[in-house]
Regions:
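Boundary of Sec targeting at the N-terminus
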Residues: 7-10
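Glycine-rich active-site loops that engage anionic ligands at enzyme catalytic sites
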Residues: 50-136
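N-terminal secretory signal peptides
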Residues: 15-65
Length: 136
């Protein structure tokens, strides 16, 4: 499995991410996004499921979600503020991609973050969204 590594230690990302974190590609329709992954068991297990095609559903005008084919390890935290571009695991098998920022009391396991999430809201224009994740 080939994974790309970001070489920009000065990027404005979550400090819990390593200096040279692993990244994966995410495609919604013909738009490609880069997702920087957290260094945790859930993110590592997620990479092992790639390539992965999901039909994600819109919910609450701030997220899209889909059940994964297999459970992933979870270590949920209460982030308080969810940021647009956060890729999280809800429970052990539901992948959630947030396209709007808001306050939340829910608990999630962080998987990663879309590096430039500005175009995500425009991609969520229907109830069911095809999303593909690749490790290269």
């Amino acid at each position: 499995m080939v994974c790309s590594f970001a070489g920009h230690a000065d990027m404005n990302i979550n400090p819990s991410l390593k200096e040279s974190p692993m990244t994966v590609k995410m495609n919604i329709d013909d738009q490609q996004f880069e997702v920087i992954l957290h260094d945790n068991p859930a993110a590592k297990a997620f990479v092992n499921t790639l390539p992965l095609q999901l039909g994600m559903e819109e919910l609450n005008a701030n997220e899209i979600f889909a059940d994964l084919p297999h459970k992933l390890p979870s270590s949920p935290v209460r982030p308080g503020t969810i940021h647009a571009g956060d890729l999280m695991l809800y429970g052990t098998q539901t992948l959630v991609l947030f396209y709007a920022s808001f306050e939340s009391s829910y608990r999630y396991t962080p998987i990663g973050k879309v590096i430039h999430p500005e175009n995500l809201p425009a991609m969520v224009d229907k109830k069911k969204i095809g999303v593909r994740f690749n490790d290269h």
